[in-house]
């Protein structure tokens, strides 16, 4: 059993407990609700329900049970493992591979491959459906992803992400010629009120900060490096589209007619850096841009 403690602040007053947990940890809201239902969330000695309203002064204790026997079908999916030890795995995910099972994608995901590779040696923080997953990248985004092999490693890695101490750099090809050599996009992101499948810049969304540097200009296109300060769903895609420079090939936020006949956005998680949860060593990994991405650049 792993224990996580979160101190509420005045700004959290009135928030539902399950949302508060999800916003302040790497635990998903649905799993937070289940932990409440199962009696694993407390304030002092009192068990709390998911609909409990935060007062703004309390300390919330979350007891995360050890992994259940995984119900995910192990699948022998080839994994491009960049690094692995007893605590973490760094995997280079190809475009088109979902990170975890979801309706319509119950198998053939990165998690199915991880369960085959690791057995039950994956953290349980994110529940049975997302064992080991510390953070996610979209199905059609390629690149580096951190996986935790135990709860202690997961909590420490999640804390680094929350405190903005982990480094995540992406490379993207965007539409249009960005005039500035660098910039910062600081716009809150939340669900699109008119399309729940999409995210959008919304005034009451969660804080989202993306830094970008221009790497090369190609007339109608710009190659950029994007550095995440926060990690909201679709953050880079939404932010770049919000300044008029959507990612080439993006089916949700891009232009409708692309001339390159792509299967998804040209967005690659190129570099990731973090402090090892056990040794304290600073680790950094880099992944080359995939071939299909390079092929487009050669045509420009």
Where are these regions (language model features)?
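RNA pseudouridine synthases
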Residues: 1-300
């Amino acid at each position: 059993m792993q224990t996580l403690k979160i101190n509420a602040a005045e700004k959290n007053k009135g928030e539902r407990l399950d949302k508060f947990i999800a916003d302040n940890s790497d635990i998903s809201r649905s799993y937070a609700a289940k932990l409440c239902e199962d009696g694993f969330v407390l304030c002092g000695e009192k068990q709390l329900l998911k609909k409990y309203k935060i007062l703004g002064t309390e300390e919330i204790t979350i007891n995360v049970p050890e992994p259940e026997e995984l119900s995910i079908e192990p699948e022998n999916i080839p994994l491009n493992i960049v690094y692995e030890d007893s605590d973490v795995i760094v995997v280079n995910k190809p475009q088109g591979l979902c990170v975890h099972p979801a309706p319509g994608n119950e198998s053939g995901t990165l998690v199915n491959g991880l369960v085959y590779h690791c057995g039950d040696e994956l953290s349980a923080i994110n529940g049975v459906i997302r064992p080991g997953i510390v953070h996610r990248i979209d199905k059609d985004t390629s690149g580096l992803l951190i996986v935790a092999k135990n709860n202690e490693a997961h909590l420490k890695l999640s804390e680094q992400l929350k405190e903005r101490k982990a480094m995540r750099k992406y490379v993207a090809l965007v539409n249009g010629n960005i005039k500035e050599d660098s910039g910062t996009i600081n716009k809150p992101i939340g669900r699109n009120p008119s399309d729940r499948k999409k995210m959008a810049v919304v005034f009451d969304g969660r804080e989202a900060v993306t830094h970008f540097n221009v790497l090369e200009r190609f007339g109608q296109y710009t190659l950029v490096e994007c550095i995440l300060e926060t990690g909201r769903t679709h953050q880079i895609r939404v932010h770049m589209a919000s300044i008029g420079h959507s990612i080439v090939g993006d089916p949700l936020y891009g232009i409708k007619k692309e001339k390159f006949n792509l299967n998804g956005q040209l967005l690659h998680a190129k570099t990731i850096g973090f402090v090892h949860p056990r040794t304290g060593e600073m680790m950094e990994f880099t992944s080359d841009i995939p071939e299909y991405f390079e092929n487009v650049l050669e045509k420009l």
